[in-house]
């Protein structure tokens, strides 16, 4: 019998497959609109309306709120930045503990370390590969400050039970929803059941702008803290654009550009279509692979 390519046989495909392209002419048109203005970022780290970014960034945040039926959204330059900002907003710091899944991308754990905290790994359940709720209960200690539930491969953790546990223990529940945009748990969008949820705009995610991330929450306080983290921790009260007189949080440059925001807006509008395409590709692979013994 012929050897498979992995073992030295002749490959069926002798050149790399073309990357899957989700950028349409609409995104190209929007990107050109921004390029023609010459204003590729709308941020200023000072009091004023531009502390919260430019018009495209604000429009993307409005669209995220509308799409996922949530009060506040905060764009940042990556989902890793979003996880870090959310943990800071939750008050996670030195010697705290953050419960999370070991079955995830590294940032779900390393962002806790970036805050000076310790990631506590809790095993996953076997049906959806998400945090096992009963094991989460056993892992909670007086040092537990947050639970980071990872919704992986489009599947949701048992978010209602995790939220109930978090509320009872006065712990913040953060959803790492990078791999499940548009998924629902009991008819509620994943990413919106926890105190905060994280979305990714990385190039291989469903909605992509090359790099980027979004934090969503129903808490004005948490949203404002994330905004401060995003823009150097400048002491600005966003609602009134008045100088606050003191800094109460250390911030970074986690700002998303106008160009990225303009590309993300039409991508978000096509979320259902993009998810359906991925589901069709997955179904095809499952069907073909099942033919092998």
Give the residues covered by each predicted segment.
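Conserved PLP-binding active-site segment in aminotransferase class I/II-type PLP enzymes
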Residues: 1-80, 84-88, 93, 167
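Generic structural signal for small/hydrophobic residues in well-ordered secondary structure
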Residues: 30-31, 64, 82, 98, ...
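Active-site region of PLP-dependent enzymes
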Residues: 180-186, 193-293
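PLP-dependent aminotransferase-like
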Residues: 88-177, 184
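Active-site phosphate/pyrophosphate- and oxyanion-stabilizing loops and adjacent acidic/basic residues
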Residues: 62, 160-163, 283, 287
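Short amphipathic alpha-helical/adjacent loop interface patches that line ligand
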Residues: 57, 61, 133, 282
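Conserved beta-strand->loop/alpha-helix structural units within folded catalytic cores of enzymes
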Residues: 69, 85, 101, 207-211
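Buried hydrophobic packing segments
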Residues: 82-87, 108, 112, 213, ...
